[in-house]
């Protein structure tokens, strides 16, 4: 999940250093080839993405994200309510390249675009949505299901406006954020997504921004109401454990050409050496002692087309 620029000032001013807990990938889950411009640590003499350079040490909390969701280990919770989504297309403001993903931001001073229900006690206002994707269609999602990953993952980021005065405060506190995760899989052309894809040539470079009004992101949601939920963190600095994750079970279909347009974006500003914006996902984190709850019974069959994680790493352009 991408953190807003306004959090960078908070992060840089944060006192003290937090402990690092080394992430270890289980042997049965070989590592995906994550771009070292986006990962949390340095290897093979590759530089970190600038987003991570202001972090002295990565916090070693026990509620970090993303995770691998084990279908049969998730616990059905009959008390989970249906998730209610109400977005006002008029609150959509613009789309911009922040050097890590592209974000579509929304006006959030009122409750015009909110979610409620599900595992949430309060209304949460929509702040922005963005995507994570891979260099090829075999991987790209941050979360995985039974060790399978998807070509891309959509994150719709909301904040608790009942308990907090602004997004920046909510992003640093427990139960401050609610993020809906939606997997993207290869399939038919997505007509509504294409409206967004058509803007991408205008924001190829970092910091480019264009107006993008009257868009309802619920058109990017699957029709199936089923979801998993767990307590986790931001997947970019400051990695605060402030997120209630709501991961939709059913993916949405997009075609290969639409994903290829994502890959035309750049991490870099105009005039700098070009670095393709691909593999902008964080490595999987340990589940630790957390429980992943589901809103559906386990007699469902996983009706998704996903790629198994590759057994060997490949270099990213």
From Swiss-Prot:
Substrate binds at residues 235-236. SUPFAM superfamilies: Carbonic anhydrase. Strongest expression in heart, pancreas, kidney, placenta, lung, and skeletal muscle. Not expressed in liver. Its cofactor is Zn(2+). Inhibited by coumarins, sulfonamide derivatives such as acetazolamide (AZA), saccharin and Foscarnet (phosphonoformate trisodium salt). One of its GO terms (biological process) is response to bacterium. Gene3D superfamilies: Alpha carbonic anhydrase. Residues 37-296 form the Alpha-carbonic anhydrase domain. Keywords: Lyase, Metal-binding, Mitochondrion, Transit peptide, Zinc. Mitochondrial carbonic anhydrase that catalyzes the reversible conversion of carbon dioxide to bicarbonate/HCO3. This is Carbonic anhydrase 5B, mitochondrial. The gene is CA5B.
């Amino acid at each position: 999940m991408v953190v807003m620029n306004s959090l960078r000032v908070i992060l840089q001013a944060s006192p003290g250093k937090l402990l690092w807990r080394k992430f270890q990938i289980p042997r049965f889950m070989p590592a995906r080839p994550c771009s070292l411009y986006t990962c949390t640590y340095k290897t093979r003499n590759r530089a970190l993405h600038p987003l991570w350079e202001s972090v002295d040490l990565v916090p070693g909390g026990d509620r970090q994200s993303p995770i691998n969701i084990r279908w049969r280990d998730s616990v059905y919770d009959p008390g989970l309510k249906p998730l209610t989504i109400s977005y006002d297309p008029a609150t959509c403001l613009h789309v911009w390249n922040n050097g890590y993903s592209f974000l579509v931001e929304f006006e959030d001073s009122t409750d015009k675009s909110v979610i409620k229900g599900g595992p949430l006690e309060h209304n949460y206002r929509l702040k922005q949505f963005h995507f994570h994707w891979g260099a090829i269609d075999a991987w790209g999602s941050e979360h995985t299901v039974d060790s399978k990953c998807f070509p891309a993952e959509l994150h719709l980021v909301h904040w608790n406006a009942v308990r907090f005065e602004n997004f920046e405060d909510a992003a640093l506190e427990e139960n401050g954020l609610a993020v809906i995760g939606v997997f993207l899989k290869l399939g038919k052309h997505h007509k509504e997504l294409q409206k967004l894809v058509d803007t991408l040539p205008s924001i190829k470079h970092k910091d480019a921004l264009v107006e993008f009004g009257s868009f309802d992101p619920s058109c990017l949601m699957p029709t199936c109401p089923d979801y998993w939920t767990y307590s986790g963190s931001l997947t970019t600095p400051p990695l605060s454990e402030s997120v209630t994750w709501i991961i939709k079970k059913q993916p949405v279909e997009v075609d290969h050409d639409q994903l290829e347009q994502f890959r035309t974006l750049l991490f870099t500003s105009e005039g700098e050496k070009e670095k393709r914006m691909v593999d902008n996902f964080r490595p999987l984190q340990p589940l630790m002692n957390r429980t992943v709850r589901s809103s559906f019974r386990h007699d469902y069959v996983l009706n998704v087309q996903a790629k198994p994680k590759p057994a060997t790493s490949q270099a990213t352009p």
